[in-house]
Amino acid sequence: MSIDGYLARDDHRLDWLIGTEGEEDTRYEEFYASVDTLIMGRNTYEQVLKLSPDEFPYEDKTCYIVSRTLQDSHTGTHIVREDVLSFIKNLKNEKGQHIWIVGGGELLQALLKEKLVDELYLQIAPVMIGKGIPLFPPTEQESRFSLQQVNQYKQIAEMHFVLKEDH
């Protein structure tokens, strides 16, 4: 995300990330290997398809798309239309590795409100874009996390947080 908390420009473009020194050096492969399930909203899903039109980049994982309006999805993905919070609560109780919420916005906010997010991995690029799609939309919800680790990959900072149990 940008220093000022945005995932993308208003039109979902990520051009501001291009050329950020270190973006290719993060431990993404290690993180990705620790995940067996991905969940994303329709907007994130459509952006993934635009960025990778020839091959869906998450074919080796179980992938759920949260949308009430999406009619069709890529082979191997599953559309979740109703009662997303109950679906995710049940999913968290299944055996497996980590669940990755790809993107952010409204879906992430709803999950935070219900305390369904255990950890946050935030990567911050040294760019301010001024406006765009925020990772965390405004809310009345307060959540407390404990900082576990900070890594630097050239110009990218990564912070790992764990939700505090007592809050």
Question: How would you name each of these model-derived features?
Answer:
Residues 1-167:
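Enzymes that bind and transform nitrogen-containing heteroaromatic metabolites
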